[in-house]
Regions:
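Acidic, metal-coordinating helix/loop segments flanking the phosphotransfer/catalytic sites
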Residues: 41-59
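Two-component/phosphorelay signaling modules centered on CheY-like receiver
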Residues: 21-40
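Non-catalytic signal-transmission and effector/linker regions of two-component phosphorelay proteins
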Residues: 1-16, 22-23, 29, 46, ...
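A Lys-centered signature of the CheY-like receiver
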Residues: 115
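The short loop immediately C-terminal to the conserved phospho-acceptor aspartate in CheY-like receiver
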Residues: 65-67
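Short amphipathic alpha-helix used as the core "switch/output" element in two-component signaling
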Residues: 46-50, 72-85
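Alpha4 helix (beta4-alpha4-beta5 surface) of REC/receiver domains from two-component response regulators
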Residues: 71, 75, 96-111
Length: 131
């Protein structure tokens, strides 16, 4: 059974997707767009921070393990919490050895998903966080 469309959002809410995997970025971009969100994708935390993304984003989805990058998703979470504590941050990971969900929630994350991501659950959480 496919994803049910929950609702279209107006005005467009901007969701930043930070993941070094092109397929994950594209998949999340398409999922978010199908629910009426505007997704802005970044291959690294550094690219996100160098853009106007931090000031424009209504929610951030960040991979915790960003290969070949200087800043991890955890460091990005800490930076966002220091400068924009009101912006929801959802952490994602594909690593089975990653720390438990409670660790990231204690650090200020608003949600945590393991890949492959349950699209309906992700959209439901974003809807909840942005209402």
């Amino acid at each position: 059974m496919g994803l049910n469309k929950l609702k279209m959002h107006s005005p467009l809410r901007i969701i930043a997707v930070i993941d070094d995997d092109d397929r994950v970025r594209e998949s999340l971009h398409n999922l978010l767009a199908s629910y009426g969100y505007k997704a802005e994708a970044f291959a690294s935390a550094e690219l996100f921070l160098a853009s106007d993304g931090p000031s424009r984003s209504d929610c951030i989805i960040a991979d915790i393990h960003l290969r070949k990058r200087q800043m991890t998703g955890l460091e990005l979470l800490e930076r966002v919490r220091g400068s924009q504590p009101e912006v929801p941050v959802i952490i994602i990971t594909g690593k089975p050895s990653s720390r438990p969900e409670a660790f990231y929630l204690d650090k200020g994350a608003n949600g945590f998903f393991r890949k492959p991501i349950d699209g309906q659950a992700l959209i439901a959480l974003i809807d909840l966080l942005l209402t």
